[in-house]
Amino acid sequence: MYPAHLLVLSAVCVSLLGAANIPPHPLNLINFMEMIRYTIPCEKTWGEYTNYGCYCGAGGSGRPIDALDRCCYVHDNCYGDAANIRDCNPKTQSYSYKLTKRTIICYGAAGTCARVVCDCDRTAALCFGDSEYIEGHKNIDTARFCQ
């Protein structure tokens, strides 16, 4: 093997080792993003729904500021309820679902962690699709508006 080949091979191995330390997105988050993309208007991206209002994004406090923020509030509470199911972590729980005819179908036995989490995400995604997106409610001053 030529020295140049060894150098390239070494670089590839180092790159792969570095990539192995990057934590993957939980499958649940990917599923939820796909549901949101399926239900929201084409001109919006799922990312526009993070840091919206008082509850869309990490955490939440105060009263929801509009219908869309209320979707996130209900979703947060739904995840809280799901977390009470034995061995259930809603943020990492995988589940099965189907996107069809402008709706979302969740599979699995009723009451199981997977089904409850899927239903939480389904309800929120459909709610996003039915709620008005107000540009001025993105990246609001939560210390001021969410008490």
From Swiss-Prot:
The keyword Lipid metabolism applies. The active site is at 75, 121. Disulfide bonds join 54-146, 56-72, 71-127, 78-120, 88-113, 106-118. Its EC number is 3.1.1.4. GO terms for cellular component: extracellular region. It is found in: Secreted. Ca(2+) binds at residues 55, 57, 59, 76. GO terms for biological process: arachidonate secretion; lipid catabolic process; phospholipid metabolic process. GO terms for molecular function: calcium ion binding; calcium-dependent phospholipase A2 activity; phospholipid binding; toxin activity. Its main location: secreted. Its cofactor is Ca(2+). Expressed by the venom gland. It is an enzyme of class 3 (hydrolase). Keywords: Calcium, Disulfide bond, Hydrolase, Lipid degradation, Lipid metabolism, Metal-binding, Neurotoxin, Presynaptic neurotoxin, Secreted, Signal, Toxin. Gene3D superfamilies: Phospholipase A2 domain. It catalyses: a 1,2-diacyl-sn-glycero-3-phosphocholine + H2O = a 1-acyl-sn-glycero-3-phosphocholine + a fatty acid + H(+). CDD domains: PLA2c. Snake venom phospholipase A2 (PLA2) that inhibits neuromuscular transmission by blocking acetylcholine release from the nerve termini. PLA2 catalyzes the calcium-dependent hydrolysis of the 2-acyl groups in 3-sn-phosphoglycerides. Heterodimer; disulfide-linked. The A chains have phospholipase A2 activity and the B chains show homology with the basic protease inhibitors. The A3 chain is found in beta-5 bungarotoxins. The A3 chain is found in beta-5 bungarotoxin. Belongs to the phospholipase A2 family. Group I subfamily. D49 sub-subfamily. This is Acidic phospholipase A2 beta-bungarotoxin A3 chain. It comes from Bungarus multicinctus.
